[in-house]
Curated annotation (Swiss-Prot):
Function text: Involved in CDC48-dependent protein degradation through the ubiquitin/proteasome pathway.
Keywords, alphabetical: Cytoplasm, Nucleus, Phosphoprotein, Ubl conjugation pathway
Coiled-coil regions listed: none
Any GO BP: intracellular protein transport
Region described as Disordered: 224-257
Entry GO terms, CC: cytoplasm; cytosol; nucleus; vesicle membrane
Protein name in the entry: UBX domain-containing protein 4
Phosphoserine modification, residue list: S338
InterPro entries associated with the record: TUG-UBL1 (IPR021569), Ubiquitin-like_domsf (IPR029071), UBX_dom (IPR001012)
Subcellular location: Cytoplasm; Nucleus
UBX domain mapped to chain residues: 341-390
SUPFAM superfamilies in the record: Ubiquitin-like (SSF54236)
Highest taxon in the source lineage: Eukaryota
Amino acid sequence: MATIYACRGFHRVPVKLSPSSTLQEVILSSYKQLGFSDWHNLELLHGDKKVDTSLLLRLSGIINGAKLIVKESATNQSGKSSSSISPQSKKIKVALQLPGAARIIDEASSETSIKQLLERHSLLTKVSHVLINGRNFKSEEFDNPLLLYGIREGSILIRLFPIKAQQSIVSEQAPVSQTFNGDVKEKKNADLMDIESENKKDDIVESFPKYPVDAHKLLEPLPTPIPSLPSTPSSYQNLPSQSLTGESLPTVSNQEKDEGVIEKVAVNNTPSVSSKSPFPKKKSFSSMLAQVKKEKAENNGSDGYDLQPTKSQLELYQSILRKRANQVSSTSLTKSSSPKPLPSSAIVKFDFGNGKSIVHEFSKDDNIETLRAFVASHLSPEESTSFQLTFSNYEALPTTGLIVEHIGRAVVRVHTISDPVYAQR
């Protein structure tokens, strides 16, 4: 459920709507609380834009908590009473659409009901319900005017859904008799097919050869063969040998003791059916995997985690270390492959410390001695014999080499005897 606020001046009325409700319900639910006596000539504004009140909330683009202004339409603000319906209602272009038929175009006012539209074109008895802007209206709602559903002006499409046609009793008699006759014919054909199949079965049975059957032999149980003794002890080698059958057991002549011994041997050597199979059971993959995990957990401790690296992990780690050792750093690679070219000149700004500064450009062939001679030429004879040169960060300037090797574009400070920095040095 969404809450929409109907506003008039400083008054605000909350209205709860479902997504399938029309915006006309905002007017119908709030017009009395906002001080209006009639809802027929009221319209909605969202900001400064007029809202189509026939749209469903889910199709209107209005979000939850939106504020809609309720006001009288411009046609009703000409001094007429708001309780009376405006006689100059606008014409609405209506299109009636039946499935499988051409559209019927008609014009109606907002006070016209759906029932009146259908009666004009003799469609009232043929239609069960209609669909307007995605909302279904049943026959009980046909008496309401279009204005009640928010249809005030413009054009509207009404989809008509016809009543399901029911066949009359006279028209049903013919197909019933036809289907009954067809069922009888099908039943007769099925019976004929069953008779033919039974005759074929009898012919097949009679074609088999006939043998005499002895019923007594069929009822007799089959003899169970007793397996021969695998080995005979040395103490019973003198016993007479006799074949073992299902009807008689081996006997020994004229000696009761020997008979007892033979019976004991026969009992001990009869095959016994044991529940345990002589062949080992084939273990399933899941049981083998569970056993391996259990053994690993016992070997590794109570935590159950295997922290020992495998052979493949060790080999991978060693290959990574070899690659890192063979890699050359980017700085050394750039230095060796492409040496930095020396600048063609060096621009130096000399700061003499008393607010005096000179900028001079040296060529790539000038060395540090040339630079010192240039500085000495701008000093007094006393100061030119002893002075020091430093960079802007007071780092001492080299005494040998080319200028472009050490200076590209820099500030050089000149320290004389009167300079306290020179005295400290």
